[in-house]
């Protein structure tokens, strides 16, 4: 996801420096070229050799290292960097960067960088909450740095409070949001639905389907990475919530309808990827239904057709896309759905096609519009998500 990107990781002298090694490793696994620059104090907590083994690149500490190629190294590094992140950032380094001090390799390089810059302060709670530190962080924000708020918990000093460096996985999400994709959805509001619904029979049992939510979650993440403000209305899934996405958890088809109806008026693009129940029990038992020797018939009633509602109540300029899971006559049924629902695009797939079933990480999608049919090959759901978004914004 970060192939072709150069990430500059600045490591300063705090106990959380060990987490920077895990961050470097994670970025390398995402195919980024990771350059590391350390303060001398940072080398007291973790050795440059650790980062060199993880990244396959020489670590910079000394501004006047005579072993580097003949060039102004901090300028050369700043020019080829796509993003700089300082993690952990001590109070001292935050102060230096806020006031333009450049007395070592890290601060000198940071001053020369014109790429997106992230900083993750990590320190004792009292130091973090000190008005001087807060003023310095606000200055950094004014100068274009994105400040990643520290986590709360037990600190190395024994105190409990705010000041922990976030976990590497969270830091990676900030980096991905900043540089992983072009921001062609910046300024757009995108509403996604995902997952199954559950229609209760009694306090114990419910009617549901096999949807894992993976496709909808992939679309939500892709839209976020492309700069959109994303709202995800999701049924029950086992998938962690995507970073930087507003998540609305629902259970039943009626709950999904109410959430979608509330969010839809402000959305520029709506993609309904959820597998919503078409029918729900007419009556929900107050207590667990006991089995008997006779057969059981459960009367069902129609749920609200959410996609049709969206098509009938769209605002001007709004793009609406639905999904169609079929087992036969996929194109014919999906074209009919496109017309009947009054939407702009149907993303159709065939449950019987290899790689396109429930719960898998791939999909085979056909994008159907009023005047076009585009057959996508077998792809990862992440790549399918990007293809859907690209087609949608062209409508």
Task: Please give the residue ranges for each predicted region.
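A cross-family phosphate/adenosyl-ligand binding-site feature
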Residues: 1-118, 124-213, 217-395
């Amino acid at each position: 996801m970060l192939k072709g990107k150069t990430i500059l990781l600045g490591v300063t002298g705090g106990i959380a420096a060990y987490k920077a090694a895990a961050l470097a490793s994670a970025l390398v696994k995402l195919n980024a070229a990771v350059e590391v620059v350390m303060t001398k104090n940072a080398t007291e907590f973790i050795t440059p050799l650790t980062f060199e083994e993880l990244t396959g690149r020489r670590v910079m500490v000394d501004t006047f290292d005579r072993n580097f190629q003949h060039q102004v190294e901090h300028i050369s590094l700043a020019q080829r960097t796509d993003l700089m992140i300082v993690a952990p950032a001590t109070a001292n380094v935050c102060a230096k960067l806020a006031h333009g001090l450049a007395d070592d390799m890290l601060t000198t390089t940071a001053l020369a960088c014109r790429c997106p810059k992230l900083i993750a302060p990590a320190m004792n709670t009292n130091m973090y909450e000190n008005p001087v530190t807060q003023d310095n962080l606000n200055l950094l924000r004014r100068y274009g740095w994105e400040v990643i708020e520290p986590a709360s918990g037990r600190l190395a000093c024994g105190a409990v409070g705010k000041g922990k460096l976030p976990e590497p996985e969270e830091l990676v999400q900030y980096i991905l949001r900043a540089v992983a994709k072009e921001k062609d959805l910046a300024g757009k509001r995108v509403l996604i639905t995902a997952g199954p619904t559950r229609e209760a029979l009694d306090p114990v049992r419910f009617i549901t389907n096999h949807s894992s939510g993976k496709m909808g979650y992939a679309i939500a993440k892709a839209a976020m990475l492309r700069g959109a403000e994303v709202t995800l209305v999701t049924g029950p899934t086992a998938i962690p919530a995507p970073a930087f996405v507003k998540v609305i958890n629902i259970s039943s088809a009626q709950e999904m309808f109410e959430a979608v109806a509330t969010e839809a008026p402000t959305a520029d693009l709506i993609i309904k990827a959820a597998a919503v129940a078409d029918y729900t029990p007419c009556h929900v038992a107050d207590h667990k239904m006991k089995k008997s020797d006779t057969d059981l018939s459960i009367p069902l009633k129609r749920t609200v057709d959410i996609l049709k509602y969206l098509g009938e109540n769209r605002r001007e300029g709004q793009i609406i896309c639905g999904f169609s899971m079929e087992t036969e006559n996929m194109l014919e049924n999906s074209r009919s759905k496109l017309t009947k629902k009054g939407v702009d695009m149907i993303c159709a797939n065939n449950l019987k096609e290899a790689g396109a079933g429930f719960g898998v990480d791939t999909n085979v999608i056909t994008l159907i519009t009023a005047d076009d049919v585009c057959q996508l090959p077998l792809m990862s759901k992440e790549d399918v998500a990007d293809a859907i978004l690209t087609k949608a914004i062209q409508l």
